[in-house]
Amino acid sequence: MAQALRGTVTDFPGFDERADAETLRKAMKGLEYGSSLEDDVVGDTSGYYQRMLVVLLQANRDPDARIDEAQVEQDAQALFQAGELKWGTDEEKFITIFGTRSVSHLRRVFDKYMTISGFQIEETIDRETSGNLEQLLLAVVKSIRSVPAYLAETLYYAMKGAGTDDHTLIRVVVSRSEIDLFKIREEFRKNFATSLYSMIKGDTSGDYKKALLLLCGEED
């Protein structure tokens, strides 16, 4: 699979409310690899996982920030019917709603879903899906709830344990350094009882370490 497929769900259009979706979509074309990222996805994945990735790449997420409470109720009920109340799972319903609704709308849907079903949407995804699709849907939910919290978790697990996922570490720190890295640092400290700065300092070395720490800023 081409290197272009590596990254986080926030690389897909529509997750960063401060960035233009079409600009992000163009940035993901991956021309240096001789094909678009969508071509890579179709060539290297299959099933509902492939379908979800393609929907995310197509940048059809509703940009309207207004909340239609009737539509929120309808989507929450549809997800409940497609999962917990169904023998088997209607994966297409999850893919359509998760891949096309606005960020602000989905946050309300997740709240309404909890009210209707008594379950967090993450619990339902865990029970009703599996494998790569489950992991992708959970990543979408995390990023919808909070991009900084999702990326803080991504950075933590890029460095936790033996070895370091240098690609993810560089990608996130560099791409978010002028967007929301301070908020990511706050979430990192809150959720992992250590600072992003100190973990980078202990997990990297040389000029690579110096560059990342410079972008990261001072110790929290």
Label every PLM stretch briefly.
Residues 1-220:
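Structural signature for extended repeat/solenoid scaffolds and their inter-repeat hinge/linker regions
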